[in-house]
Amino acid sequence: MAIGLEDKKAIVADVNETASSALSLVIADARGVTVGKMDALRKLARENNVRLRVVRNTLAKRAVQGTDFECVNEALVGPSLLGFSMEDPGAAARIFKDFAKEQDKFEVKALSVGGKLLPASQIDALAKLPTREQALGMLASVMIAPVTKLVRTFNEVPSKVTRAVAAVRDQKKDAA
């Protein structure tokens, strides 16, 4: 079915807007995956703030021009499902990786982060990135660690004095 010029422009503008604000992109081939399974994937993507789009490669190439994902042009061959991570850079990679384990016909083609095109074999590295909450928790624990050590050091001085006084007291009791 032919798409009109105005519709094509709208699709390009929509995908460009999404790509401009996305943190990472995962491209997959979903040929042979049932509609029911794709609906489940779309639902999971919505829950994780990942935007999925299936667009013609020529439109996708135009849409990513001027964004960090301009490097994916060579990976846009054949049917492509684009997964844009909007909040967590590893979200789309985790979703696609888990889905590919369940579906033999689902194949990750490439990924892109920070303006670099990565092969599909690098999906584990991207999927293992911590979520925003995990990263903030790690940062907080790193920031709190020196304060915790300082508090322990301050608490250790009085307890050493107390142990020394108790030892002297016990020594005097034994001597008497």
UniProtKB/Swiss-Prot annotation:
* A cellular component annotation (GO) from this entry: large ribosomal subunit
Report the InterPro entries cross-referenced here. Answer: Ribosomal_uL10, Ribosomal_uL10-like_sf, Ribosomal_uL10_bac, Ribosomal_uL10_bac_type, Ribosomal_uL10_CS_bac
Q: Which domain of life is it from?
A: Bacteria
One of this protein's Pfam families, by short name?
Answer: Ribosomal_L10
Among CDD domains, the record links this protein to: Ribosomal_L10
Q: Does the keyword Ribosomal protein apply?
A: yes
**SUPFAM superfamilies from the entry?**
Ribosomal protein L10-like
Example of a GO MF term:
structural constituent of ribosome
Q: Please name the HAMAP family in this protein's record.
A: Ribosomal_uL10
The free-text function statement in the UniProt record for this protein reads: Forms part of the ribosomal stalk, playing a central role in the interaction of the ribosome with GTP-bound translation factors.
Report the family membership: Belongs to the universal ribosomal protein uL10 family.
Give the multimer and partner information: Part of the ribosomal stalk of the 50S ribosomal subunit. The N-terminus interacts with L11 and the large rRNA to form the base of the stalk. The C-terminus forms an elongated spine to which L12 dimers bind in a sequential fashion forming a multimeric L10(L12)X complex.
Task: Supply the name of the protein.
Answer: Large ribosomal subunit protein uL10
